Amino acid sequence: MKKVFLLGLSMFCLLLLNAQTQTIRGKVVDKETRQALANVSVKITTATADSLLSATADANGEYAIAGVSVGRHNLLITLQGYKEVVLQNIIVSSAKEVILNIEMEEMVMEIGTARIVAKSKQTEPNNENALVSARLFTVDETDRFAGSRGDPARMASNFAGVQGADDSRNDIVVRGNSPQGVLWRLEGIDIPNPNHFAIAGTSGGPISIINNKMLGNSDFFTGAFPAEYGNSVAGAFDLKMRSGNNTKTEFSTQLGLFGWDLMAEGPFSKKSKSSFLVTYRYSTLAIFNALNINLGTDAVPRYQDLSFKMNFPLGKKGNLSFFGIGGNSNIDIIISNQKESSTELYGDDDRDQYFKSRMGTAGSVFTWNLNKKSYLNAVVAVSNQNINSMHQLVFRHAIDSFIRPSGQKAYRYENDSIIKNLRYTFKTSTIGTNLFINTKL
């Protein structure tokens, strides 16, 4: 029976190896006007058999290259009257199609002698007002850089002038500035600290709520911020969400140290160009604990997060999308149920500790082409953050008459914001006292 199983598994693997191809597709638009560009040439330049593969964008600016082998590939995008665009190290996997939406910049030439040099757009930021101290990063880099773990903050610690913390948190020091001065933005809106087990007033945490599989090309700033980043004094992450596959429904799952990921994307209907993209993650350690697997401690971190984006093209005139991200986390370090004090890996041996945190952001992006030279982009979003920490002191071997009540403080922090320039903030704080006595005579 064992030999039959191994033989069947080997045949299944051979079948998979014979079908390792995928499709690269997307849309090409003008960087300034957001208008679709037709007759754009998209060619694979990797020195393999795939170098013969290419495609031409249709009247809607859409292109598709089928039969691309699995691996890393380079793309060259050209159109007469526009600057060349070079995309390097594009990862193609057999699990899902690769969607690349490309922006091309018009090339202006004066009459006379002209020298044209092809320039890679790999690190040029999306924000046209960013002249220095800004860098574009891709989804691939959040996985490929050393110690990134799919986290944009940990990835940024590999850049010049950026120093990361220890492995327990993803706080970053940018050019000597405090990590508290780092700003997080999503789709053009400031958002609260997007990390599980976040501490009030900080910008980092042990585990990021952001799933890098949801991100498109995004910007990271280390200084000389444009005026729109007015609340940043150290660094800024300007994150963009990608749209889901609008022609094919795809599902994927991944189990790792930091969680079990489930992701789905596809079109709402075959006739529509609208699409959805949603991902959910749950704590791996919490799953192991539910299966009665001994983790060496009862203080198991539990967390989960959800991200989504729904995209609805409005023809050639504009686009409407809805996005959201949120997560909650909690951990309880309880020692009061022990007869004698013991040393836990985390926490103190004289108190029970309860910690909860959650954050969420949901909004909408509306883009409307006013004419061939201008467009309107409006973003509306609502954000919320709640952090609750509670400590309960435990007294052992005590005499009741000599016990003086003292003990726990509960801290609560909330932050609600509406729209980018019209902001409403609500903050509350509570302090309470509680006493737990474990008397042993």
Which ranges hold each PLM region?
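Short strand-turn segments of transmembrane beta-barrel domains in outer membranes
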Residues: G204-S208, G216-P226, G235-G266, F276-Y282, ...
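Short sequence motifs at beta-strands and strand-loop junctions characteristic
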Residues: G67, A165-D166, Y229, Q254-G256, ...
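Outer-envelope beta-barrel architecture signal
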Residues: Q180-V182, M214, T247-F251, S272-F276, ...
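Flexible loop and strand-edge segments within Gram-negative outer membrane beta-barrel domains
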Residues: T297, N319-N369, N384-K427
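Transmembrane beta-barrel wall of Gram-negative outer-membrane proteins
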Residues: T23, G256-Y282, L295-I333, Y354-V382
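Periplasmic N-terminal accessory/gating domains of Gram-negative outer-membrane beta-barrel systems
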Residues: D58, K83, I90-I99, T113-F225, ...
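Periplasm-facing N-terminal accessory domains of Gram-negative outer-membrane beta-barrel systems
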Residues: A19-T113, K119
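Structural signature of outer-membrane beta-barrel domains
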Residues: K121, P179, I191, R242, ...
